Amino acid sequence: CLSRGLGDVYKRQIFYGVMVATSVTQEKSNRTIEVLVTSADTKILFFGKVLAGTIASLCQAGILMLAIVGAYKFNQSAWGGMLDMLLDIPANVLVTYALFGLGGVLFYTFIYGAFGALVSKTEDINKSAGSIQMVIMIVYFITLFQLMNIDGIAMKVLSYLPISSYSAMFARVAMGNVAVWEVVVSFIILVASIIGVGMIGSSIYRMGTLRYGNPIKIATAIKSLRKQKNK
């Protein structure tokens, strides 16, 4: 169950992240963005795209979960109670999974959206955002490998880093003994990081959407933002 939960978040991060990045790039390639930025604030546009993708992810997950539970309840006798353990998952594990899973999707979707603004063609998205997918994949496998040492120092460090806390803290709560304050601190760090990444991402979105041609490197985009800030 734990590995499936981690895998579900992993798939949603990539699927909806790429979806948002593709949407941003398509608007840029067909010049729709030029009309949008004249009628709405770029921060609202950017945050709206990311939140829409996240809400779509939540709706899909909710419908799927209701369908699974409903189907199992309807045919529970046929299963012979084989999956009753799924209905007995502790509330703290479910809440941690929901909050940190949502945070993880938001965190990386903001990053994907920013990277989508750095390219002008949809075929360049994988090249530009490939590093994000690599980070998500590395975090996923490291977390799986560390399940055998759930209370080790590596897992504790991962549970506080925003790039990995969504999976590491959930795993620690599900398999180990974690103090409430640890979960709260980790979640506060994740929320603060989401806000920070969202603000930086919206600035990159504003700058990148009106620049056409070759893909813009993320380092170049950050340098441009620093120059604009210092003016």
Language model: regions and residue ranges:
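Single conserved hydrophobic/aromatic residue that forms the stacking wall/gate
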Residues: 1-7
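Long, hydrophobic alpha-helical segments
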Residues: 7-18
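Alpha-helical transmembrane segments of multi-pass membrane proteins
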Residues: 38, 43-60, 64, 68, ...
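Membrane-interfacial helix-loop-helix connectors in multipass membrane proteins
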Residues: 69-97, 176-178
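A structural motif at transmembrane helix-loop-helix junctions in multipass membrane proteins
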Residues: 98-134
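Junction motif at the cytosolic side of a transmembrane helix
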Residues: 118-120, 191-231
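Transmembrane helix segments
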Residues: 126-157
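Membrane-interfacial helix-loop-helix junctions in multi-pass membrane proteins
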Residues: 145-160, 164-192, 231
